[in-house]
Amino acid sequence: PSIAAVFTWDFLQYDLVLTITGSRVIPWTFPPDWSSPVLERLEWKTDVLEAFDASEQRGSLRLAPRKRWEFEAFFEGRVRRYAEAASWGWGARVWALPVWPDGAQLGAQLNAGALSVPITTTLRDYVAGGLAVIYTDPFAYEVAEIASVAAGSLTLARATTSTWPATAWIYPARLARIADRVALPRWSGQASGGRFAFELVAPVDYTPATGATTYRGRPVLTERPNWIGGYDLELSRKLAELDAMTGARVYDDESGIPAGRQRMRWTLTSRAEQDAYRRLLYALRGRRGSMWVPTWTDDLVLVATIASGASNFDAEWSGYTRQLDGDTGRRDVRIELANGAILYRRITGAVEVSATVERLSVDTAFSFTIQPADVVQVSFLTLARLDSDAIELAHWTGDVSESSTTWRSMQHEL
């Protein structure tokens, strides 16, 4: 982003030296208003081919997602004038956009000529060959190029040109373009603000990971969602209608089972949780990947002791035998015990023992005795994918963020 060149003209009597310094990129130095969250949007692109029976073939069309940052900012006085001037003059060009949630304070004075910056880099968006913005206010900043990243420091490609106080902040930065339309409502002759959206110029890669737990060869979602506000379950069918417009209509349930859509909300309260969530999203790659997703609800209630070695259990009557027996999406269960153990089983048969009890057979016998009081929850386990290629994280601070995912159950033969 910076220009640092020396031109030398070699004359017979003397040399003429011309030093040129400058910058090819301008940083966006107007911080967000943290009273509303800073939105990070990751967007993959998946080609989904659906068969008659609702089974799918899916392929990723992007190696890495596009990323978008969106936030509100407010200006007053000289800052307002500079913000409007910069938006006017540089609006169509590329900005160095600070990644606001990943900033950290220097903590100690950084002298001019420094090539190493002691700073916390763990789980922040610093990358070798990328940019960093040293910042104190919209008018006092320096854009630096990162040569390498260590756990507790950055090594710069060129020395700093100014001395920075301990209170200065340093942010990782990404090249981005602002949206083609920027609204700047003016509250008075001195105050203005608006909502600003930036699309990163290049996709951003991340190390994918789904966790260690698997079932039938596929990863399992093991983190519970945030129940504040609840989450919705929607059942939709691939129902074809034949209507000749002259008599009764004919319907064909092409898939035989509904596609369930569950919306789950997540509250991430540390950078480690944010990192694990991002790794999961990158492993799924939007609608491309799939994993086993529990309903996290009390779907079956144990009513009798399960003996060690038994391959069935008695559950409170809920219509499973009549309505669900063997259906894809309702034949796998997650059994959570009070001691922390989690068991995964496939239901292979069901019979009504009485008007209040159903006996369900499973594929793998239980290796120890389980009392009804030992069971915290029995939930259905569904193979599902994300229902959208775009996922947003709402950052309230650098360490706290919220997100939501909608899972779509799949027709499968696992």
Residue ranges and their predicted role:
Residues 44-51, 58-77, 184-206, 237, ...:
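Oligomerization/assembly interface segments of phage tail-like spikes and tubes
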Residues 24-31, 36-60, 66, 73, ...:
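Charged, low-complexity interaction regions that mediate assembly/partner binding
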Residues 1-24:
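Feature for long, exposed domains in two main contexts
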Residues 25-41, 136-141, 152-232, 355-414:
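Cys-His-centered catalytic/binding microenvironment captured across papain-like cysteine peptidases
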Residues 56-58, 249, 383:
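Active-site-adjacent core segments of small-molecule enzymes
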Residues 74, 78-163, 207, 221-227, ...:
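Autoprocessing Asn-cyclization modules and mimics
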Residues 9-13, 134-138, 200-202, 335-339, ...:
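Short acidic, glycine-rich loop/turn motifs
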Residues 243-247:
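Long, hydrophobic alpha/beta structural blocks
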